[in-house]
């Protein structure tokens, strides 16, 4: 980013602009290099103004809580926009249908949406309590767990493009699959960018590039008590099955059809395998944990080891849920 140009624009922006921002502070793995530029918008309008001020060739990464994201130790040449400070509103949205709607901004934590829906006697969003990221990331990759998937409850989404133009889009404008969301008109398989769309580099800047600002979820009337009980059960299962006491990014790989990535990795004898300060969890083999001083390179080495081992033993190419960006 041309910082002189950014400084010229600063007077009209209300958010916080930082340079050489350590990404380890902002990703759930607590490891990795720095972003050349970071911006924390004051609200959605400020985010729009910032995007309009950016040079057209500036790579942009939008993120919330940094779940499913790893920035290599050499850092990221581009701008990271953080949504979790300001774009976190969750409120009722009356859809005029049987049930009700919940409007949630991209930076709102997914579990917050689940709890809000339950408090308002709306059912169908309970599974979001098991997704550690934000709404933006859940939309970008169709995050899911415990039998639920994000786009199964989406009524419509609000987006913004590189030029700062806002749109309202419906699910039929996207090709939605398991951990995959691609806008139909975005040729070349370009993926709408959210918190952690699972590919390994920033896309070439394009005016067709869009990010999710918010979603309205279409939910059914239900029993708040039953929803809260279901959320409690889900969280108990998560605590029992996953290494939540150590920094991690959730599931590293998608589950292959008819199988589980964790089973395949464990069958390769990799459970508990360490590289530097990182380790394939001895509690859940599809998790890689930071034991306290891991570098991004340590984590990536274990990802590559798991991919190579499963390919050699089973002939299965594991697909990543996590996104790795930046330079080694």
Could you describe each region identified by the protein language model?
Residues 2-135, 145:
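Anion-binding (especially nucleotide phosphate/pyrophosphate-binding) glycine-rich loop
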Residues 69, 114-117, 125-129, 142-149, ...:
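A generic local secondary-structure boundary/capping motif
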Residues 122-127, 132-171:
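Glycine/threonine-rich beta-strand-loop-alpha-helix active-site module
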Residues 17-19, 25, 31, 69, ...:
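Phosphate/pyrophosphate- and phosphate-bearing ligand-binding catalytic cores of soluble enzymes
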Residues 38, 101-103, 156-158, 214-216:
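Beta-strand secondary-structure signal
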Residues 40-41, 70-73, 81-82, 116, ...:
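Short beta-strand-to-turn element immediately C-terminal to the catalytic PLP-Schiff-base lysine
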């Amino acid at each position: 980013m041309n910082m002189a140009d950014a400084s010229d624009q600063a007077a009209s922006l209300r958010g916080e602009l930082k340079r050489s921002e350590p990404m380890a502070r902002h990703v759930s793995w607590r490891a990795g290099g720095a972003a050349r530029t970071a911006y924390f918008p004051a609200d959605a309008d400020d985010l729009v103004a910032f995007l309009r001020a950016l040079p057209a060739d500036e790579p942009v990464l939008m993120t919330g809580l940094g779940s499913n994201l790893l920035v290599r130790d050499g850092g990221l040449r581009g701008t990271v926009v953080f949504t979790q400070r300001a774009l976190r509103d969750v409120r009722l949205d009356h859809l005029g249908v049987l049930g009700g709607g919940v409007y949630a901004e991209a930076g709102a934590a997914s579990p917050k949406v689940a709890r809000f829906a339950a408090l308002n006697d709306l059912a169908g969003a309970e599974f979001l309590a098991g997704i550690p990221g934000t709404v933006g990331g859940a939309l970008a990759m169709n995050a899911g767990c415990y039998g639920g998937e994000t786009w199964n409850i989406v009524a419509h989404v609000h987006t913004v493009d590189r030029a700062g133009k806002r749109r309202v889009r419906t699910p039929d404008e996207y090709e939605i699959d398991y951990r995959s969301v691609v806008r139909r008109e975005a040729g070349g398989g370009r993926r709408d960018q959210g918190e952690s769309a699972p590919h390994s580099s920033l896309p070439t800047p394009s005016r067709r590039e869009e990010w999710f600002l918010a979603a309205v979820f279409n939910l059914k009337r239900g029993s708040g008590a039953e929803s809260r009980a279901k959320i409690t059960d889900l969280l108990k299962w998560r605590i029992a099955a996953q290494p939540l006491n150590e920094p991690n990014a959730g599931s590293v790989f998608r589950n292959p059809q008819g199988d589980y990535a964790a089973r395949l990795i464990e069958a390769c004898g990799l459970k508990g395998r360490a590289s530097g300060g990182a380790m394939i969890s001895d509690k859940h083999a599809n998790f890689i944990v930071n034991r306290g001083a891991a570098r991004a390179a340590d984590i990536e080495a274990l990802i590559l080891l798991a991919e190579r081992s499963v390919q050699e033993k089973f002939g299965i190419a594991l697909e990543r849920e996590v996104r790795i960006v930046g330079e080694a």
